Amino acid sequence: MDLEAFGANPNGVLVPISGTDPRTGTQFRHKAFLPHPLPREVPELSAETWAPVSQASVALGRLDQAGHQVPNPGLLRRPSIRREAVSTSALEGSFAPFQDVLEADVAEEESEASPAVREVLNYVEVAELALDRIGLRPISVGMLSELHAILVRGTPGDSQDAGRVREIQVVIGPEGSRVEDARYVPPPPGDQLVSGLSDWESWIQNEGIDPVVAVGLAHYQFEALHPFDDGNGRLGRLVVVLQLIRRGALHEGLLTISTWLEQRRKEYQDHLLRVSQTGDFDPWVRFMAQALRAGAEAAIDRIARLLELQDMHRETIRTYPLRGVAAQIAEDLIGRPVVTPTAAARIYDVSYQAANSAIARLLEAGLLDEVTGRRYGRVFVSGDVLNAIQG
């Protein structure tokens, strides 16, 4: 890490570290960056930043209103979570095609999923659990530790530290690089890290700062502390949505920001690093406000496209006509665009034969296509819904 680049930051200090790098077995003696606790009042921000902050607030309000107008927002939450899961994992270098994720989501055997898809599905499980709980529990290190254990389960990041604040030194940089050559070295494990997390946990409950600004500050601090040995980026971006819900800016987990960030990965990483080097929050808050606005507007458009498709599906239900479980599956396609007879039987509590017959009716009605070409283990997809989700 370029120590000179961090020397002038008034919002943190360099602390000495030494030990054995667990990745290489080599000894190191260097310094890590320890951020000071976040300010209790809004840091000085320029008019150039307050404008996108205001625009983000308006966009989030429109998204929240759109969520309120949907009879079953939980159905729309499903594709939002899975879209976010694919992009947030891609930001960490784990790439899985969206359709592969949805197919694995309904697969009978977990072992059928590739390692990349498994990581994405772990995130889906984590996000659904967190969104179900956030109305009842505040954001805390304990909650995130529970989520972390699920996030890394069965992946290369699964270790004895899964579900616990890390007890090893980690670095951010090219794989295999020396500690001294890392792009960023987070605080060492121990009392300083634990204290920093405690301050962060207390700060995030503070409602005296504009929610958009607060999201930016909290996300930076979480990434700078890097409390876990893996999965910090994915958890940190999930906290963005949880934080907005706790603050009342949103009521449903319909926001996705990682698709926008994925397209600006280097800029995202550079902004985070620059705050640690300079202590200047202004460009970072502006960047995050732009991400929130873009994510909210994309979600609003996605909801509109899906509801339009649902209206078309309802027309097919009426005119074909479709009844019973076939009508239920058709009604839910905007949230479950990939189905199998086994999954449908489980979801709608009917026999395999009834589910299979219902899917055959949807195939005849043109609402589904079979994508495997197999006689057994067939998978059925609504291509229109997939396209609408991916935009």
Task: Describe these PLM feature segments.
Residues M1-G391:
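FIC/Doc superfamily catalytic core
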